[in-house]
Amino acid sequence: MGACEHCKTCPCKIYQGYKQPLEVPDHRDIMIIGDSVTPLETMHNTHMTGTAIKLLFQAMEQVGLPTSEDKVYLANAVMCAVPKKKGKAFPKEPLIECRGRLLKEIQKVKPKIILTLGKASYQGLTGDFNVKITAKYGAIEHFDYCGDAIVIPVMHPALIMRAPNDYKVFLTELHLVKQLYGGSGSNDTGITEWQILKTEQECLQAVEFLKQFPRVAADLETTSLDYREAEFCVLGICFQKNKVFVLPREMQHMAKKFFALDNLRWTWHHGKYDRKVMWRRGLTDYNVEGEHIFPHQNDTIYMHYVLDETSAHDLGYLTKTFLQAEEYKYKMNQEFKNVTHDTYEQYFDALCERVAVDADYTFQLEEALEKEMNKPGNESLVKVYNMVIMPAARFLAQVEQNGMLVDPTILEEMGIKYKKLLADIQSEIEEAAAPYWDKERYMQETGAKSASDKFKPSSPKQMSWMIFDRLKLKPRRRKGRSTDADVLKSIDEDIPLVKLVLQHRGVNKEYSTYVKGILKKRDIDGRVRSNFSLHITATGRLSSKEPNVQNIPASKGVGNVRRCFVPPKGKILMEVDYSGAELRWMAFLSGDKNLKEIFIQGRNLHKETAKKLFGPDFTPAQKMRAKAINFGIPYGREAKSIADEFAISIEEAEKMMADWYGAYPDCKKYLDWCAEQAVLGNYLQTPWGNRRRPGLVTPDTIAGLQNEFKNFPIQCSSSHTLLYTLIQELDYDEDLRRNIRMFEYLKKKWDVAVVDLIHDSVLLEVPMDKETVTAVSRYVSEKMIETPVKLFNCEVPFKTDTDLGPDWGNVQAFNNETGMMELENEHHEVTEVPYEEWIESVYHYDNYNQPWYVDAVSFQQHPEPFVRDISGEPGC
């Protein structure tokens, strides 16, 4: 039945349909099903003519699939022009009514392969309106009503136009289609075989057996993604393709025997998590430095990151991309939703299969990724992987284990203040809304069955009614009836209610993130352990989450959240910070002589910029503007943002930016050149060897991509400078039987622990005696300063500052040359105070007698609570 004939009999008759029937051909190899046609397509009797289908054909040609009309038939789930509303689900009715017509087209076309583009087309084909489509992408499915056709759901290319980083994932899905279309099937990954080691004797025999192999790949299955709750289920160790030993829970204590094998190179996929779980459960031995032994020489997640920083790095994606393996996780995950300590036996067979396949695929992936990395032209990638990325991954695992000690009483006090502040703002909101809030009218106009007597800003429905229906406001940014922060901030009218709602949301977010969030993540030894990631940002900058300890505000809301982070008794917190690291890298990379001269002569950059922009008699406020320009321009900050921050006109902000470019002309040339590479499709490379590739460039993303390209070289170089400094190899250590790394040396010589990395600074726990504090500050500063010179012969000098504090919220400047504290008051006047006098006045000795600290120390001395005793449990 043609589209026109179907539309005439369709009871839906809501949307514009075709006036002339479309021809449905006989026999095409590939049938592509979109969601619905557009009004323009119905008028011109065409379909699938937009930019999204052009992108689809471009991708199909790239992987070697046909796109000609004699091979490919383009169809739609719905043959009328259904309006697509952002944030709204595609309506069910037309999909249901049009399904019969679609199935008849399939019977006539008799395709070998059917591609469904996005969610609506899959729903139209299958009638499944509860599908989680992202779990289906790349899956191979068969349905009786599709005959012999293979059905493969893929991303809608229109989504990729808005999120071009997904283009490579999309290509991977099409690579699978190409293999099936060409009859080659999946790559020969083989059939995984595994042996379960059920006794200690079998484990010891396996250990002896592994002494003949050079490498293994391993994977750990647990009961939770939260390392604090995760319990060991099974450990898989792959020693040959398709050959895996599986260590069950009952033999978990034998893992140490395998980890002690020094002939093996161990490869994991994101092994940092596995390491943390094994440590948390007491399943590793310790070396002479007190660090636990967890062999982690290679990691496929980081190998892929240096090859492609913009794509996904999960094991499922990588196995499809590099091994052409069929997707398996979307099937297996269904069995793992309820794996707990008590359901271990129920899911044991599935756990063994999962861990064996993951270890086997990791083993095969390592080989495939090594081939990619060793291709001609990739020498810089090998260099940065071996010199920075892998050593940094192991180092960050240690930083995570160190954790940051948290005083919960500080957060509890702040929580009380936050609750009061939120209640006060809520009262102001109710008062401001009272003249407009009409409960009965709201229920009548919205169809709500009930409503509160007072306006509730936390109700999305009440908020949208108040903004759009009652106050009839017209935000410059509109997302349907959304009242998110971007929408409310774009309201030009001066409405007190809107400002109060924004304030309430901001304060509530602070309370949830920085008070409740940190308390929730606090471990039983009193510390929070963030998750640092090297592979999340395309710019190469380190990121942190759960909690984000790089983004703890110095002062926010009701007080300084950083005050809750404290050192253990007898130690002090030391923060050593690069001064203007990114701008110094900018001077070096751009070669701008004016900027280089300022740093070489040791002049204050912000004062010098203020002179160039405002003359020699600049004010403190103008110096702050100069500082904002200095840091903002490399990040692509625009004139409007500067104007809004300082309450000046856009014209003034534009003149300031133009004057900055005039003062540092080679910086402008360099930034423009970086932005141009994104448009030209070229990659950028840092002196360290990292690359930033543009990927798919679309009109929607080009501006943001150009800003990323401007910032990438300086941001990545700055981040790696700090990381490398801390992981660099020093002299040979007799105890370790290898060269000791700097963070290990700090621990061994001074008992110093690295507890946080904040972009360009490092936070340390240091013994509080003056001699140690001075020595550590000098040593760390010296090493940080020398790195750019030693590695890159950088003529721009780098500078560091040291701050000390009894907690992270009260750090003050320390001069490691004089041994004096340099205390600055609110008028920016500096007073020198002897360190000994200062430490006596600020150190919180009473804190270490409080119950929370006594409990933490008690746990550290007797860490049994970390390890769950499962002796006598079923299956043991």
List PLM regions with ranges:
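A polyanion-binding, active-site-adjacent surface
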Residues: 1-184
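Acidic beta-strand-to-loop metal/phosphate-binding motif
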Residues: 112-118, 217, 263-274, 575
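Conserved beta-strand -> loop -> alpha-helix junction used to position metal-binding or nucleic-acid-contacting
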Residues: 155, 285-308, 314-316, 602-607
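Conserved "right-hand" nucleotidyltransferase catalytic core of DNA-directed polymerases
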Residues: 179, 183-247, 284-295, 310, ...
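Metal-dependent catalytic core segments for phosphate chemistry
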Residues: 227-249, 575, 582-617, 695-699
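Nucleic-acid-processing active sites and adjacent nucleic-acid-binding tracks
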Residues: 238-267, 404
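Conserved catalytic core of nucleic-acid polymerases
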Residues: 344, 394-401, 422, 450, ...
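C-terminal polymerase-core module
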Residues: 420, 424-427, 431, 435, ...
